[in-house]
Amino acid sequence: MEDLQLVLFILGAIAIVAVLVHGFWSIRRQQPKSLKDSPMGNFYKQQADKESPPKRVDADGFDADGIGAVRVRKVGESNPHETPPISPYLKQDVKAEPKPLFKHTTSTEIKQEPVPQPDFSLQSPLATEQQRGAKVSRQEPVLNGHVPPLGQSHAAMVAQKALEQEKHAQSTTVPTQTALFDEDAYLENTESEDEYAEETVDEGLDEPRDVLVLHVVAKEGQQLNGAELLPCFLTLNFKYGDMNIFHRHVDNAGNGKVLFSIANMLKPGVFDPDNMEQFSTQGVVFFMTLPCYGDALMNFSIMLNSARQLADDIDAVVLDGQRQPWGEFTKQDYLHRIRANA
């Protein structure tokens, strides 16, 4: 029994050793061999050397293609025989200038004599000399020292005075020109034109016979603020103009004839657009004269709608000319007055 166990142990050890040897041999066989270790490497190298012809090299060490042997040089080492490369910018700058095809041998200068200009002046020679003397004698004032700043109104007054003095000096130095037309005839023509214009204006529109008035007043215990009134006026296409009040024109841009206007209900009845933020009033007045330009009924309808819109925007009340609440009876009365003056 002991002999059988010994035999089995020996056979198992032999089998294990055989398996290990076979594994190492398989791994060794699967690894690729390098070209140096291969016996055929030297053979192929020798064949290549035999087939390739020897390269012909000249005295300087360059072959037929101009390729020389590889040289290893240190960094920073310079060759004294090499020529420095030319910058492309220098190549662009150095260009041969084209020679002119035609060479001018002689040059002729043409001198143009000034042409005397005729004297179209209306003044006599004596007056011209006097005017030149006045211009030469006139000198510009020189301001020395520090000048304190002036206010806008004061500066405007000073500029106006200076302009008047200059005009007066020119009028005294420049003599009277010779008249080329009949002054009396010209004055007669201008007077006749003015009379004709006045007649056409009078014929186009008669004197006002009636005035339609609407009041927009604040509620009891309140006032209308100017900061709120100004944007409302501009929204309703009113434009600040004559008599320092706002007007509604035929054109919404503020051009053409005036249809109706807005004034302050309190005396003096004017507005100051520059100080509307500090302005307050009890109410404003819409008024339209009869007869008016265009359709009177249409103009009154626009004025009534503008008054109602303004009252809605600023929380106010619309009253008639007698400061009574606006109603249907008052509306019929205004329409009757419009038809009577149409």
Swiss-Prot record:
Membrane disposition = Single-pass type I membrane protein
Query: Which keywords describe this protein according to UniProt?
Result: Cell cycle, Cell division, Cell inner membrane, Cell membrane, Membrane, Transmembrane, Transmembrane helix
Q: A GO BP term, please?
A: division septum assembly
On the Cytoplasmic side, which residues? 28-342
Mapped to this chain, the residue ranges on the Periplasmic side of the membrane are 1-6
Q: Where is the composition biased (Basic and acidic residues)?
A: 47-57
Function recorded in the entry: Essential cell division protein that stabilizes the FtsZ protofilaments by cross-linking them and that serves as a cytoplasmic membrane anchor for the Z ring. Also required for the recruitment to the septal ring of downstream cell division proteins.
Q: Which family does it belong to?
A: Belongs to the ZipA family.
Designated name of the protein: Cell division protein ZipA
Q: What is the lineage of its organism?
A: Bacteria, Pseudomonadati, Pseudomonadota, Gammaproteobacteria, Alteromonadales
What gene does the UniProt entry assign to this protein? Answer: zipA
